């Protein structure tokens, strides 16, 4: 099942979102330092340092193609781009309907970073740097573009 297929399935099976949401809500009650990969963690764990990692859609499609994922066997960049667009639309629709929130609103996140031209190490270092500033109550830019 591709990520897009899972998103389409979840549009008609809200019990999956409910289970995930309850797990996220429970994290808000803990004192643990954890990293969560979630489109909605900012909503359910509002005390968190929420980061949105954006990527140019062509870069994202190329990365997926280069990874040669069994679950996403695209035959062309165009096919990958179309699947990414459909997935994003499905997620946006689902979260708007379920929670009344716009996940594309960058104001929902403490920090936004464009990963299109950064290595994974550069992205991790920037996130850690900005997390430390946030933890210390120091100002930092909301968005780090190209």
Walk through the language-model features, giving the residues of each.
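Small-molecule kinase domains that catalyze NTP-dependent phosphoryl transfer to phosphate-bearing small molecules
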Residues: 72-126
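Conserved nucleotide-binding/hydrolysis micro-motifs of P-loop NTPases
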Residues: 55-60, 119
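ATP-dependent small-molecule kinase phosphotransfer cores
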Residues: 1-45, 58-59, 70-72, 82, ...
């Amino acid at each position: 099942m591709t990520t897009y297929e899972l998103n389409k399935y979840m549009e008609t099976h809200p019990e999956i979102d409910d289970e995930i949401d309850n797990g996220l809500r429970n994290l808000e009650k803990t004192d643990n330092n954890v990293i969560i990969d979630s489109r909605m963690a900012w909503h359910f764990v509002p005390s968190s340092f929420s980061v949105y990692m954006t990527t140019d859609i062509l870069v994202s499609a190329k990365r997926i193609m280069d990874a040669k994922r069994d679950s996403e066997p695209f035959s062309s960049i165009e096919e990958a781009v179309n699947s990414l667009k459909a997935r994003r639309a499905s997620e946006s629709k689902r979260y708007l309907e379920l929670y009344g929130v716009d996940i594309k609103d960058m104001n929902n996140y403490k920090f936004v970073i464009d990963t299109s031209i950064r290595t994974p190490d550069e992205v991790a270092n920037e996130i850690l740097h900005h997390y430390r500033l946030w933890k210390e109550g120091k100002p930092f830019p909301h968005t780090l573009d190209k």
